[in-house]
C-alpha cells in the first residue's frame, strides 16, 4: 500500500489548503493508499519555511501551501525547486491572474477570509437580536444591546434597528408610552448606549393621520390628536431627562441619515469610555 505524506503550509490557519488536500485524497481508493496530512500554520518568517522544507525532504512529503505574502511565497518556491520537492501552490497562480485583471494591489494579509466569515456571522447575530428584542419584547436585551433606541410611536425605531443590525450593531428599541412603565433596567444600564428619537408635533400628527387613513379609520381618533401627541412628547422628555441620554430629531431625516448620526454618537461615547 502506498503511503502519501502531505504537508499543509499556510501563513494563516491552513484550513483552505487542508480542505483541498483532503478533497483530492478522497478521490482515491483508501485500500490502495494511506495518507497523512501535517499542518504547519502561521508561516510568517523564512525560518518557518526552512522548517517545512526540512521535514518535506526527510519524509518525501508533498507540500500544499497557501501563502499570500510575496516574499514568503517566492522563498518557498525557490526552496522547493532547489530540493526538487513536489508541491502545489493553491493561491499563487490565481493571485497572479487577479493582479493582471484588477488595477489595484491586493492587501497581502493572511487570514482575511476568516475575518470576513466572522464579520458575516456577527451581522447575522445582530439581525436576529434586533428581531428578538424589537418593541421592548424582553428587558433582558437591555444589557446585551450595543444600542438602545427610545421613542414614541412612528419614530422609525424598528427600521432603524434593522438598518443598524446590518451594520453589525445589536440594537434593542423601547416604545415610550405614558400608560406603560418602562423596564427598571433602563435606568441601570449605561446611558451612553441609549439614544432617544425625537419628532416634531406637526410631523407626528401628519404621520399618524396618514396611518389612520391606511387603516381605514377616521382622523379624529385620539391617537392622532394634538392633545395626545403633546402628552406623549411631554412624557418622552421627562423620561429621557431621567435617563440622561442624547436626543436625535428624526423629523426630517431619512433612515440612513439618522442611523449615521446614531453611529457617530455611539462611537464618540465608546471613545470617551
UniProtKB/Swiss-Prot annotation:
This is Putative pyruvate, phosphate dikinase regulatory protein 2. Bifunctional serine/threonine kinase and phosphorylase involved in the regulation of the pyruvate, phosphate dikinase (PPDK) by catalyzing its phosphorylation/dephosphorylation. Belongs to the pyruvate, phosphate/water dikinase regulatory protein family. PDRP subfamily. It holds the Pfam family Kinase-PPPase. GO terms for molecular function: ADP binding; ATP binding; phosphotransferase activity, phosphate group as acceptor; protein serine/threonine kinase activity. It comes from Staphylococcus saprophyticus subsp. saprophyticus (strain ATCC 15305 / DSM 20229 / NCIMB 8711 / NCTC 7292 / S-41). It comes from the Bacteria. ADP binds at residues 151-158. It catalyses: N(tele)-phospho-L-histidyl/L-threonyl-[pyruvate, phosphate dikinase] + ADP = N(tele)-phospho-L-histidyl/O-phospho-L-threonyl-[pyruvate, phosphate dikinase] + AMP + H(+); N(tele)-phospho-L-histidyl/O-phospho-L-threonyl-[pyruvate, phosphate dikinase] + phosphate + H(+) = N(tele)-phospho-L-histidyl/L-threonyl-[pyruvate, phosphate dikinase] + diphosphate. Its EC number is 2.7.11.32, 2.7.4.27. Keywords: Kinase, Nucleotide-binding, Serine/threonine-protein kinase, Transferase. It is an enzyme of class 2 (transferase). InterPro entries: Kinase-pyrophosphorylase, PPDK_reg.
